Amino acid sequence: MILDKTLFSSLTFSLTVLFLLLLIPNLKGFGKLSAIIGGFIALIFQYFGYPSLGILFAGILSPIIILKIKSVK
């Protein structure tokens, strides 16, 4: 599969945002885990052509799922 310009720029933008989120010093534990998981799942959604679902998952659903997992432990 050949990456077109739009998909390539979208993926590089997402990776850049994910990397910058990890550089924030106050973001520890839950925040970093949420950023990593949400960022990678957003990348997967973007790769398959659903960028809005990726944004929804990364911004809203990922922190909720991680809070549920932490409350079970």
UniProtKB/Swiss-Prot annotation:
<feature type="transmembrane region" description="Helical">
    <location>
        <begin position="47"/>
        <end position="67"/>
    </location>
</feature>
<keyword id="KW-1003">Cell membrane</keyword>
<dbReference type="GO" id="GO:0005886">
    <property type="term" value="C:plasma membrane"/>
</dbReference>
<protein>
    <recommendedName>
        <fullName>Uncharacterized protein MJ1155.2</fullName>
    </recommendedName>
</protein>
<keyword id="KW-0472">Membrane</keyword>
<keyword id="KW-0812">Transmembrane</keyword>
<keyword id="KW-1133">Transmembrane helix</keyword>
<feature type="transmembrane region" description="Helical">
    <location>
        <begin position="7"/>
        <end position="27"/>
    </location>
</feature>
